[in-house]
Amino acid sequence: MPAILTRHLPILLGLTCISLTSTAWSATCNKPNVKGYQYVGYLKDGLAEVAKDTPQGLKTGFVNAQGKLVIPTIYESMNTVDDSPEKLVPAFAEGVAAVNKNMPTGTKYGYIDKTGKTVIDFNYEYAGNFSNGLAPVRQNEKLMYINHAGKTVFTVPYDDAASFSEGLAVVAKQGKFGYINTKGKLVIPIQFNLDEGDSIDSYRFSHGKAKLFKNGKPFCINTSGKTVACP
């Protein structure tokens, strides 16, 4: 299977099957052999997301490696990027997945475990994957990171914030981005231009490097923010 380009499939970065380039750092991705769905995602922690048309519209749930539906297709589509099915994939991470569904106050995000049980209530306008015990969420237009108990660990004064990868998370403000550590401290300054249409998740670290772009040309940085050779 070809490597998945992080630049074009940012939501997949919660999975293990990622690649910094089209040939380097790739890993095997597996999908369950199941039919009857408009989309079948890659297995992560033994589960894969599926999307199915219902009278209420496209809904998502999860199947196991044998293709058995273990979490019903009751959640809203995770299509936060565009209409291509490959962008519908929220990964289970640290035993939970961020999903969204219609609530009386509108569409809200929460977290479920691998049995489908709600473990963090649907209170958020946005919710990202857990990593390093933290997940980025937006509530009442404020960005923050929460723990597995749903408690706020720290807030961040940025326009957007991503999940952690190798101890760092991308944060963006006014079209530029940098990186914070797990204490919320900005350790790589807000200085890089955010390409139009790209998710900030596409700039996360893998194997000690992050692939960025300047004037359409790629370059890489290490976790200290220094420019290094790309693989």
Identify the residue ranges that each predicted region occupies.
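Bacterial N-terminal signal peptides
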Residues: 10-19
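Bacterial N-terminal signal peptides that target proteins for export
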Residues: 1-11
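Residue-level detector of conserved, function-critical positions
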Residues: 25-231
